[in-house]
Amino acid sequence: MQASTPLADKLALLISVPTIRLDYREPAKTDICASDIIAAFNYLSYTYSSTNFVLVGWSFGGSPCFTVAAQEPERVRGVATIASQTINTSGIKELNPRPLLLLHGADDLVLTSACSETLYRQYGTGGEKELRLFEGDDHGLSRNAPEAECMLLVFITKALGLEELLDPGTVEMAGKDFVESREERVREMEKGHDLERGESLNYDY
């Protein structure tokens, strides 16, 4: 497990949802990463009596999230991804009708937005799904991070059945940058080499 992120901070502070950001033992190995997620479920169940979970995966992280969603239909209440890959994501076909949120930068140079468009189609019909492409944005959604975090917080809250917590003030706060949020995002992306292959950050907004 790793330290908190801006989204995790918002979930904890604004709607009191216990959150874990995983540092996978073997990154890019879907089966092992899926086992890590299951272990995190068990930890949260033991520590906080959590029974329902929403998974959020970034880039490769979409793969183990969809895998676990297929394996745990009772515990996983929804899945959201940011700039997901399509390799090893067949579990998305078993997610329906549980809700799905796909976010992607239209100018992503690491994994093109066509990946999320493909996942949107593979989810099928009959469930609740949303695809949002951010024009001019990159693999880390660096130009629209606060808005993306707000969308994720609202999605997670609704998927957990906690809509009553989404008052206007909470939603407004979810769309703001917390102290050092930008710097934290940059550090995490650089650590994971997610700004390579020509990617760059642009905070001119």
State where each predicted segment sits:
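Short, surface-exposed "cap/lid" segments of acyl-processing enzymes
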Residues: 1-16
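Alpha/beta-hydrolase active-site loop
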Residues: 3, 28-48
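Primarily recognizes the serine-hydrolase "nucleophile elbow" in alpha/beta-hydrolase
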Residues: 39-97
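Short beta-strand/loop motif that positions the catalytic acidic residue
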Residues: 95-96, 101-104, 108
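Acidic catalytic loop of the alpha/beta-hydrolase fold
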Residues: 107-111, 139-140
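Short alpha-helix in the alpha/beta-hydrolase fold that links the catalytic acid
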Residues: 112-122, 146
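Catalytic histidine neighborhood in serine/cysteine hydrolases
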Residues: 122-140
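Catalytic histidine-centered segment of alpha/beta-hydrolase-like enzymes
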Residues: 137-149, 173
